[in-house]
Amino acid sequence: MPVQDGISTRFQQLQKRFAGHYQEIFYNDLAEKTVVIVPSLTLDRKMLESVTGHMHYEERLLCLLMLLRMPRTTVIYVSSQPIDASIIDYYLHLLPGITGYHARQRLHLFSCYDGSSASLTQKILDRPRLVNRIRALIVKPELAHMVCFNVTELEAKLSGQLDIPVYGCDPALSYLGSKSGSRDIFRQLNVPMPEGFENLEDEEGIVQALVRLKQQNPLLKKAVVKINEGFSGDGNAIFHYNGLDAGSLNLQEEIRERLPDRLSIVANGMGYTNYMNGFKKLGGIVEEFMEGAMKQSPSVQCRINPLGVCDIISTHDQVLGGESGQVFLGATFPARKAYSRELAIPAMSIAGAMQQLGVLGRFGIDFLSVYRNGAWFHYAIEINLRKGGTTHPFLMLQFLTNGEYDMQSGEYRMPNGQSRYYFASDNVEDARYKGLTPHDLIDIAMCHKLLYDGAKQCGVMFHMIGALSEFGKLGMVCIGGSHEEARAYFEKTINVLNQVCTDCPGS
């Protein structure tokens, strides 16, 4: 979506002001600052509708309520629908060194009372009285900023109306976070990536790219088609080359004819016609499906602050599932030591290029790592110029333990010197969980000693709790002293939920 000149100019002015006040906002815990959290997934609506309970993904940024541990900070949180009071209380009770009462006085919750699939930011903009109420709570705009899932023209417009900057990237640079833009960056930096073609516009472009890939590699069995703005794998599709000969004089026609039947679309319920309409609207890429007996999908999370400083803040091994292995299910933290340090080299190269182009905020870089002949080979897959599925788990860990990730050792260390690990998932889903209210979940977790224990600094944190009763879906961050302990917390929680819901169905 192109950014209108007036909006862009105002947005850039606010971002410059942000840099001037950055030190006071982020390094003075007693500064009277305001953080406006707008957890809007401003993405393609068709893509969003394929995700079960997508509206409750707005709850993933409730981890930022931990900012209330700073006693002079005000947090304004806006959502499409009201968030149950028990969910808010659940987060506030974790605040270290702050009473729930004190925090509650500085927390302001707003709802649009709108359950449509429109962007939350659009819902806010459509309610000028709501915008006025939010603006009235921002006492010092120079010490305030907005946090979003991703930044588009809508978020830039809201930023201007609230007179506060966004800790995020100028939407004019959004192409850099698309599938095509990512490959452009990788190509310019000579970062290894799968063979493929970007900036494709339609079905014919897909056909031609599939033909060229097969001709370049006659042994290729599969290729991946990706819509530029897809997320969590739901914009992806797999093409199978079975029975197609790279030397055939009619290869292009054969692929064109077989494409509707051979293309396995990842998104639930999305047919071929809708997928191609989405591709034509947003563009995309085609690349080889990389084979390997041992494959991992690590990601590196980077941050560029308003002063232009680049940091690697975490690494994860992503857990991908679905029939095609393309759907993001969760992640383990930190990534394997065997290659986490190796990933720092291409990641910092990419982050440096992004910084030069004016990128601000957090973003993730996904890789595919293949083990061959006794070594790991890493291929850059995409840049996620937004908060992703690994953002909120890591923020939660940091808020709870006050530690830091050390890229050199590949470990996360708390102030007491101990290490922590976690397994996180946004896709814990079972029809048996439908009917469980937030109160039920928290009660079950307390009775079975699953909740995060501040003394041990281990346990389970839940998120997306609001999706549980209607969709049987929720998220978890399971923190332990080892990868094995973190995974054990996850398995125990699943077993408890399964048992409780079997013993008392529809509870």
Descriptions of predicted regions:
Residues 49, 89, 158-161, 234-241, ...:
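Short acidic, glycine/serine/threonine-rich loops at helix termini
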Residues 402-507:
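Peripheral (often C-terminal) accessory segments that flank ATP-dependent C-N-forming ligase machineries
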Residues 321, 380-394:
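Glycine-rich phosphate/pyrophosphate-binding beta-alpha loops
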Residues 271-294, 312, 324-375, 414-450:
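A long amphipathic alpha-helix within ATP-dependent nucleotide-binding catalytic cores
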Residues 172-283, 333-345:
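Active-site nucleotide/adenylate-binding loops and adjacent lid/helix of ATP-dependent enzymes
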Residues 150-151, 200, 229-231, 288-291, ...:
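Short, flexible loop/turn elements at secondary-structure junctions
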Residues 1-177:
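ATP-binding N-terminal substructure of ATP-dependent carboxylate-amine bond-forming enzymes
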